[in-house]
Amino acid sequence: MPETNGTEADSSGPRPGLRLELQAIDLDRDGHGLARWQGWVVVVPGLLPGERAKVQLQQRQKSRWLSRISERLDSSPTRRRPPCILAQDCGGCTLQHLEESAQRNWKQNQLHQTMLRLGGIDHPQAPALTDQRGLGYRNRGLIPLRRGEDDRLRMGYFRRGSHRIVNLSRCPVLDPRLDALVEPLKQDLDTSGLSADHDLSHSQGLRHLGLRIGHHTGEVLITVVSSQQLPALQRLAQQWIERWDPVKGVTLNLQPRRTNQILGATTTVLAGAPTIRELFCGLQLQLSTTTFFQINTPQAERIVACIVSWLSQAELAGPIVDAYCGIGTISLPLAAQGHHVVGLEINPDSIDQARSNADANGLGARTEFQAGDVANLLKETLATCSALVVDPPRRGLESSVIEAILSDPPGLLAYLSCDMATQARDLKRLLQPEGPYRLEQLQPVDFFPQTTHLENLAFLRRVSS
């Protein structure tokens, strides 16, 4: 395997500016090519396994060197033309240059290797539930805003490895109904003269533009994130409501703090309604500016259907506990099948929305939602439940949650994860030798085509007291 071009490489070792010829042997977890030279790992964004390229080293990152391609010397049979013209610059979707079947194969192999390495788990996976659309799947976008030195508004995601905006007029992974609004909204905000600087210098003005759509209803909610009240937005908001019938509401979210957290605590209505309707698994939900809701609605419905189907095969004498329940996207479909469900969630606003959604769908009598620390609430609810569903944030289950589960293990446990590494870590503890559980099934779900992300559902069954 060629490693250098033999012209600049020497025994002095790697340094910024050094030119090499390398061949990628794998992709890292961010979807960038990985090569080796003189014992060093070299990251080559844009290079696929098996491809050779002339590269230039840029900077050292701990035990790795970041490089950029000067010239790609050959092409993998799995390479394709990216569907987005900004794919090489934008840091949002790092696998667009890889055919989608190859994306899925790589993701499933990543899942297998991660489970084996971090969890000691060598278990067959079911084929990933895939989104055949590939594009246009995102029901929400939060897009940074900034005025350039020429005073023109830039709107787009960050350039790879930086906080510089890649100016865009469309985004192919956005729902096409939202994508059609991106350019006219940018033009309106540009001509408004309002200052804009997402979070670089934290100057006053616009920070982000938020777009959200009900996949099944077509209703749209526009949100402008700003550091302060901007009276000029009131006029724009009314114009948007009148211009586009699907736009049911325009809100202003205030984020005055110096933080990377996009949304602030205060949201006000500029025009129309504060929420939009969505139909999810046949149930009606209300989505606001700050509601946490899965980005890919059809894929979320498929994974919830898997959970409902698996739990419905068992004779459950007690209730199902849904930990990290959010607004009830798993709890309510389970209740609709006749189960009694107890939802646990630390965010009181989400609990309020879950209760409202339950009442709106006639499921209030079969659901109970509690706000508070999940570990503490589990200690009070596990003794009487027959099954547990957990859908934690990316950091995975807190140690106290795992201890609560192992102290009083329910008969069935469904663990949905958005981070395979933390899930593998947690499963290692839940599946410890002489422990109460055995792993029954791994079901990966590709929520985010063109990216490295893969969600995974693990089904565990209790085998001992």
From Swiss-Prot:
TRAM domain residues: 13-71
Entry-linked NCBIfam families: rumA
Family per similarity comment: Belongs to the class I-like SAM-binding methyltransferase superfamily. RNA M5U methyltransferase family.
Sites where the protein binds [4Fe-4S] cluster: 84, 90, 93, 171
GO biological process, one term: rRNA base methylation
Disulfide partners: none
Residues involved in S-adenosyl-L-methionine binding: 294, 324, 345, 391
InterPro entries attached to this UniProt entry: Methyltranfer_dom, MeTrfase_TrmA_AS, MeTrfase_TrmA_CS, NA-bd_OB-fold, SAM-dependent_MTases_sf, TRAM_dom, U5_MeTrfase_fam
Keywords in alphabetical order: 4Fe-4S, Iron, Iron-sulfur, Metal-binding, Methyltransferase, S-adenosyl-L-methionine, Transferase
Protein name: Uncharacterized RNA methyltransferase SYNW1228
Organism: Parasynechococcus marenigrum (strain WH8102)
A GO molecular-function descriptor: metal ion binding
Class of enzymatic activity (EC top level): transferase
Domain of life of the native organism: Bacteria
Active-site positions on this chain: 418 (nucleophile)
Enzyme Commission code: 2.1.1.-
Cross-referenced PROSITE patterns: SAM_MT_RNA_M5U, TRAM, TRMA_1, TRMA_2
